[in-house]
């Protein structure tokens, strides 16, 4: 995951960062460390003009299952040339990935405390078709922030 921060970063006595700005790559159901930066930094930029990189959190998340870690990957359409800006990456409708991802999440977390409380908020991401990966990822981040009661300043 590509991340960078600007100068003028302050630390609290317990070591937490009180910073000014962070630059993050887009992420599909981002890891906790990614979400933590939304809370720590005063301003967060999510890069939409960087070139898409395969095998990154841009279209992949990792969940914990009874059998270990499982990666869930959003399929993307092929693009012309060697590079394509993240903002132009289209989600492929090939296969039943939405159904498979939702079933994997339900299987892994369905018996967890509070899953029923959050399931109705998360299910729509697997029922609706999305055109662009960046937009899909940002809608997920917005919903996660709402559920976690985090109000980041994201651009």
Task: List each model region and its residues.
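Residues lining hydrophobic/aromatic ligand-binding pockets adjacent to catalytic sites
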Residues: 2-155
């Amino acid at each position: 995951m590509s991340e960078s921060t600007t100068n003028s970063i302050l630390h609290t006595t317990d070591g937490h960062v009180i910073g000014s700005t962070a630059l993050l790559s887009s992420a599909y159901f981002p890891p906790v460390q990614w979400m933590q930066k939304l809370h720590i930094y005063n301003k967060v930029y999510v890069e939409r003009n960087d070139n898409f990189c395969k095998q990154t959190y841009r279209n992949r998340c990792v969940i914990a299952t009874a059998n270990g870690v499982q990666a869930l990957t959003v399929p993307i359409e092929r693009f012309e040339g060697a590079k394509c800006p993240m903002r132009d990456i289209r989600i492929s409708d090939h296969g039943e990935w939405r159904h498979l991802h939702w079933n994997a999440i339900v299987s892994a977390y369905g018996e967890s405390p509070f899953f029923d409380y959050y399931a109705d908020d998360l299910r729509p991401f697997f029922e609706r078709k999305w055109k662009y990966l960046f937009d899909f990822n940002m809608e997920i981040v917005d919903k996660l922030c709402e559920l976690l009661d985090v109000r980041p300043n994201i651009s």
